[in-house]
Amino acid sequence: MKVLIVGAGGREHALASKINQSPIVDKVYAIPGNDAMVNIAEVHSEIAESDHQAILHFAQHNAIDWVIIGPEQPLIDGLADLLRNANIKVFGPGQDAAQIEGSKLFAKQLMDKYRIPTAEYKEVSSRNEALQYVETCDLPIVIKKDGLAAGKGVIIAFTREDALDGVKKIYQEEKGKVVFESYLEGEEFSLMTFVNGDYAVPFDCIAQDHKRAFDNDQGPNTGGMGAYCPVPHIDASVLEQTNKEIAQPIAKAMAQEGHDFFGLLYIGAILTKDGPKVIEFNARFGDPEAQVLLTRLESDLMQLIIDLENCQPIHFNWKDEAVVGVMLASKGYPGSYEKGHEISGFNLDSHYYVSGLKKEGQCFVNSGGRVILAIGEGPTVEKAQANAYEHARQIKSDNLFYRNDIGNKAITK
């Protein structure tokens, strides 16, 4: 079997690595991939992930059996539909179903209609309307841009001044939809769920992401500065409740409304005093949650995808070890940052997943905001954390930073 991974980040590096381990897979390709994937996949960086026709031509020319789409943009732009219409199997939803990530408003309206627990919300359609709303709304307030924003389109405002600044920041133009949400307090967690129509199978291991740029959850939101799994202080009963009240109902709601979803639904949830509630949905694996979950997963991912396609029972096997991933990012991220700084001290092995590196001559240099995820495994989260930071410290660069508290919530509970 030949499998093509679409995407260039750490999530796709982890997907390629995991698919490459499958005994039923003969060859893995990556478009555009990155320079760190060359040991596990045939990398075709000459094709852009936005060039859907070229991806289709490549898949047909190379007799690709399955395409796994990693990032959100190609899903929302309809790559899965194009490939499926050419009778190529795809793990990832079509454009219509990918709206669950592509539009915050679509997701909120669906949850509202089907009474899926989430924060109360208000929709506004212009900068002026938003500025008026924040003059009198309850605080704190969460401000979300309706479309995609690479994990950086969310502002939490604790003061009236912050709320006004947030609106001005999100509204670069006068018109556009923004969703205001009441602020939810509690412990956040990420639940990946396999979905095929109304058949939904959540992973029975959750992960916890760290969205803020700096220690102690300070600074702006990012795409994710680290993650770990399992989450020992959130017990199995919470997972069961999340499945019953969120995962199953949202799959059924999507099917009922005619939005045919096949792929991975990411449920970003928060455990409040009233139980789990939805913060966001994504139409694909989280990054960096994918890297830690796929490191811990012992099951054959390709076989699980085929079982999902056939609506067969899915059983997950996990390593006993905990996994912690620490993201090293370019200084300045999630704002502006310099590229082209040399980065060394790491091997292309299972201790690292690469997001934003490229090879220039014999050296690797940074080419993105999030650069490389250092992985640690151990019998406890604490031991896995120590190993992850040991691997992070081995990386040499004058232009990287990382958080020092990834996994602390599991250790201090």
UniProtKB/Swiss-Prot annotation:
Entry cofactors: Mg(2+); Mn(2+)
The gene name reads purD
Q: Which SMART domains match?
A: GARS_A, GARS_C
PANTHER family in UniProt: PHOSPHORIBOSYLAMINE--GLYCINE LIGASE, PHOSPHORIBOSYLAMINE--GLYCINE LIGASE, CHLOROPLASTIC
Q: Which family does it belong to?
A: Belongs to the GARS family.
Annotated GO biological process: 'de novo' IMP biosynthetic process; purine nucleobase biosynthetic process
User: Which residues does the record give as Mg(2+) binding sites?
Assistant: 280, 282
EC no. given is 6.3.4.13
Give the protein name, as stated in the record.
Answer: Phosphoribosylamine--glycine ligase
Q: Which organism is it from?
A: Staphylococcus epidermidis (strain ATCC 35984 / DSM 28319 / BCRC 17069 / CCUG 31568 / BM 3577 / RP62A)
